[in-house]
């Protein structure tokens, strides 16, 4: 059928104040009389956004490939993202666990009203790095909305990440008694709320986001008696290098199995045809 561009979308933020811009990918053979699960690809910033560059790109990650498996895929730049006004960028300063999630949910609900083929009862999310932080946070803070999440290499506790990130967007660490201002933003403090299916992934040699960020969440999930899935990639840094296609396939399989309710092909190999 050839290449097709994603649909440009505009929705309102959580308060109905600002226009939010994004992209939507649909299956090439979309049947508007059917219902499709929706997957939100997220990168919350605050130094960037989910959509990424506004320049033309023939492909944006594997979003179209994921859509072809039977999903609606969206990327929405929420409040707190750059390239807008100062007040827009500062929208959740010092509240890093916000992660634009109320904007994402508001936008997804508006899209479901606009496009009746979207099934909000089957909503998923995935992201890498800051998007991994946001995805786990979504599964813990909004467990009745997001049913499936894939959290890759997330900076789940910004006390264990670069100070030039945390202090820039959350402020200096301050302590009141036994609690500090970063504590309630850390995903391990919210892990007990998990209801859906969550996959955590991390490279064991990540020198950007140390793997102990994910171990903190794993420890909290175990203590809370929660079921989850874990993929640790030996010798991989913040990106997964030679294991990137493997992780992409695991991501596809996880959504197909748990959000679409289908059985993915066993050990499918992604790569050039021989």
Region locations from a protein language model:
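Serine-hydrolase catalytic core recognition
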Residues: 1-274
């Amino acid at each position: 059928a050839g290449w097709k561009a994603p649909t440009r979308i505009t929705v309102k933020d959580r308060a109905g104040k600002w226009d939010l811009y994004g992209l939507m990918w649909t299956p090439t053979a979309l049947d508007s009389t059917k219902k499709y699960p929706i997957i939100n690809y997220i990168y919350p910033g605050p130094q960037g956004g989910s959509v990424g560059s506004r320049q033309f790109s023939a492909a944006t990650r594997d979003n179209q490939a994921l859509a072809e498996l039977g999903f609606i895929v969206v990327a929405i730049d929420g409040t707190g993202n750059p390239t807008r006004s100062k007040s827009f960028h500062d929208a959740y300063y010092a509240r890093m666990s916000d992660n634009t999630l109320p904007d994402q949910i508001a936008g997804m609900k508006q899209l479901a009203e606009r496009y009746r083929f979207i099934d909000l009862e089957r909503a998923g999310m995935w992201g890498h790095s800051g998007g991994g932080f946001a995805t786990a946070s979504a599964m813990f803070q909004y467990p009745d909305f997001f049913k499936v999440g894939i959290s890759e290499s997330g900076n789940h506790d910004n006390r264990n990440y670069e100070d030039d990130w945390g202090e820039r967007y959350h402020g200096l660490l301050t302590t009141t008694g036994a609690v500090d201002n970063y504590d309630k933003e850390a995903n391990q403090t919210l892990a007990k709320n998990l209801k859906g299916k969550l996959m955590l992934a991390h490279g064991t040699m990540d020198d950007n986001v140390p793997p102990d960020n994910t171990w903190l969440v794993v420890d909290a999930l175990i203590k809370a008696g929660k079921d989850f899935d874990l993929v640790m990639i030996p010798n991989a840094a913040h990106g997964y290098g030679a294991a990137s296609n493997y992780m992409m396939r695991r991501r596809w399989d996880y959504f197909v199995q748990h959000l679409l309710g289908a059985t993915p092909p066993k050990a499918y190999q992604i790569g050039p045809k021989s």
